[in-house]
């Protein structure tokens, strides 16, 4: 049977591994190294990948692409993309669909297309070692990658000629690698993954269940725009400023100089993990009318730490949230695993040790662990390994917009995947012929403050009073974390569905910002939710009372009718403002005004149905206890033609 390889498609470096028997082999590339730079260059009609691309980067900066993973599945207008444009020598452009693409030699290319070149290199490396064709692979992504980015990664695999059998999260893969050599018994581990472009932390429970190792992800958090590249940029900015002070010359306008600076900064950063100081010496970095200029700067480890301390501190908040979501304290963690090349920095190791109260393990190779874990999962999927069970989670809440602009979650964050959940909603207007389902991802209770992933229409709903149609919305997330959403009219059986596509995903910064905003604005969100609820209650009460008034017209005096209409008018005005208590008071006033009429109706034997306004409007109209009032956009079929 053909092997399923494991690929760590990294921002800075990539790695490929395969399981042979009960051992995992990390495969050396043609250059003899176990990791390959994630760099692609276009030169004289030739495509260079890996070390050969890196070697010529200084002389060909505009056509040498690196850190493409930071663009995958993103929109051009995202703030993080705009920030990147000023930091890289190659050209980032806006595609026709609004995505961030790159342009080389007047040709626009999508990030998955470029990432496919790296995957092809990994595929060829594995084929050369195994001596056979390879088509199946497990590819890793940051745990906090959104639906768009996961889909784009699968697309890259397809372009590379690979059948991506599974997309798995990098920290989870690292835990699989750690579990290979671990002693039997149950344990809870924290995987701290600071790579070239992304940061993730996952809390994972490893249990022995009838001789099978079960890896259950309890929670995950992260920042998908924080990694080693940002540490490099901090050092580059410092070197540029030092040169400007000394020579009164800004190197940022010179792509060739910036490429040399990038290489020197990366080299200096690595050296300072073992040395106390290093020298950056770049002769002939540039020239002006006075002649050539040279850059010579000595950097100490303490200087590098001062420049990057804020970046390291940014990793701690996600760690706190991950522990909180898992319902654990730092002292409950048995082992801390460091993954990603940036974790070799002494300041990172010290910060992690201080937070978790224990020294991180050093026996897991931070550059190779993710590929090793992917290879293990590949062996599980191909049936070569049967004693491992992996249970992963989705990182953010998924839901739809309901009445009052509220985000109604259908699948909560840190829900185990694959999963499928449904909820029944209804219409907001009488005889509403169609609804628009708006799908959001995020932690805010205000739908508009989350990210709109996509929307679709369910049409041809038979005429019915509002609240009567039963519209079942189903979210289905597969093991790759990729979503399908459907809406079904339970009355007619008519169904419409959508797969969230790569051009409608979240930007990395938005995801991280959503969770942070949700925590910082929890009180504000609660206030909004309460206001939306009381407005919905007022709307439902008015609708039901007006209907009851019309039905019992012959039993109501003009004075009673006038009193109720005045109370309705007062409530409608109050509902337009943001005073929760005032709306509540006007609601009670309406109830009191309607009370004599409801007593007459009851006495006349018309039953409790006419007095429905005394009950919650949602309950009065819903045929199912799980029905939620939803404010759907009405679709005018004539406008669509």
From Swiss-Prot:
Membrane spanning stretches: none
Induction profile: By stress conditions e.g. heat shock.
Source organism, top-level taxon: Bacteria
Region listing for Disordered, in residue ranges: 605-626
Compositional bias annotation for Low complexity: 605-621
Keywords: ATP-binding, Chaperone, Nucleotide-binding, Phosphoprotein, Stress response
Pfam families: HSP70
Entry-annotated residues carrying Phosphothreonine: 198
Signal keyword on record: no
GO terms assigned for molecular function: ATP binding; ATP-dependent protein folding chaperone; unfolded protein binding
Record family assignment: Belongs to the heat shock protein 70 family.
Function: Acts as a chaperone.
Protein name: Chaperone protein DnaK
Species name: Psychrobacter sp. (strain PRwf-1)
